[in-house]
């Protein structure tokens, strides 16, 4: 989907200079900090109201940790998370509780994210009970039936336990639970990666239908680039805790500029054998460096085919090389 088709509203979410560092300790009795995992190390991006923003990268790049910081499941080490004018990194107590009604999550694993001891109806109704938005039990149940129907299941599933359902059905329950509080913004943390391929398209189409129906805004975290291209208006690419490229979906997939983005897209198989044989595939050399001791300068330089001496010393700052196309690489002009 092109930038021209994307919503033009002001940003609903703005992430500025986000850092999330975890201490590494050793010892049992007298444990001491011996290092720091820089899971997120200076991330900036915006999400406009009504759009789906993709956040992609290899496993361990920090995309899920970024999502957890936005949800305030983790307290950021530094930076700002401006949601509708309020810095979520700083709020506490009732203010944070109120914001969490507006910001919800769909978890990656539809098996471990549902309580096996609770019936589906109780799982979906629990957020309403906790936040006190629908104290009447009969109205809560009616809302549960409505959400189950909207998510393609139906009221009969309310009395089932999670183990009686398939993976796709469980993920629909997770989606219904995320909708229970009438949120504005949903973090979708790889919501289809644990599902069969035959079910993935159904869930992706459901998410798109719900976005249009309820005016939702998504941060869609994923590593399946074909799903991201189908669903997202804009995409940010992360590598080792940093965003290396941002652009609208069509531009990023058709004209990637950062060497890492180019390598990611080159690794996606093409179903046409003739096209697959004819393209220039250059796999990324080496291994992903440790986030405990990341490389100096550009974190991608040890694996980059375009790296020069400057890349080893100077961390590239994100800059707009074309309208709406931001790249963190000094060798891109």
Predicted regions and their residues:
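Charged, flexible cofactor/metal-binding loops and thiol motifs
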Residues: 3-11, 25-31, 248-333
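Conserved ABC transporter NBD signature motif
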Residues: 79-87
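Conserved ABC ATPase "signature" region
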Residues: 86-87, 138-156, 262-266
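A short, proline-enriched helix->beta-strand linker immediately N-terminal to the Walker B motif
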Residues: 180-184
């Amino acid at each position: 989907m092109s930038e021209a088709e994307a919503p033009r509203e002001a940003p609903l979410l703005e992430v500025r200079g986000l850092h999330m560092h975890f201490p590494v300790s050793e010892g049992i009795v007298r444990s001491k900090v011996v290092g720091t995992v820089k899971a997120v190390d200076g991330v900036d991006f915006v999400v406009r109201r009504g759009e789906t923003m993709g956040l992609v990268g290899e496993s361990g790049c920090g995309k899920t940790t970024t999502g957890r910081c936005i949800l305030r499941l983790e307290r950021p080490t530094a930076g700002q998370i401006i949601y509708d004018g309020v810095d979520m990194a700083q709020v506490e107590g009732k203010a944070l509780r109120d914001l969490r009604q507006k910001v919800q999550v769909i978890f990656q694993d539809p098996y471990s994210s549902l309580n096996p001891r609770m019936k589906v109806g109780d799982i979906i109704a629990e957020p309403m009970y906790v936040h006190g938005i629908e104290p009447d039990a009969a109205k809560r149940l009616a809302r549960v039936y409505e959400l189950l129907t909207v998510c393609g299941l139906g009221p009969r599933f309310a009395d089932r336990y999670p183990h009686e359902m398939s993976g796709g059905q469980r993920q629909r329950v997770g989606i219904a639970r995320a909708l229970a509080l009438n949120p504005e913004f949903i973090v979708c943390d790889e919501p289809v990666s644990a599902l069969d391929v035959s079910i993935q398209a159904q869930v992706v189409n459901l998410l798109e239908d719900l976005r249009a129906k309820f005016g939702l805004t998504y941060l869609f975290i994923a590593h399946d680039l074909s799903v991201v291209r189908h669903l997202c208006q804009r995409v940010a690419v992360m590598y080792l805790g940093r965003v290396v490229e941002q652009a609208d979906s069509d531009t990023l997939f058709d004209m990637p500029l950062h060497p890492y983005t180019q390598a990611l897209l080159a690794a996606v198989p093409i179903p046409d054998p003739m096209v697959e044989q004819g393209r220039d595939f250059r796999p990324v050399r080496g291994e992903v460096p440790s986030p405990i001791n990341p490389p100096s300068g550009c974190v991608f330089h040890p694996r980059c085919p375009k790296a020069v001496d400057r890349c080893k010393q100077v961390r590239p700052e994100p800059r707009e090389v074309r309208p709406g196309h931001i790249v963190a690489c000094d060798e891109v002009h």
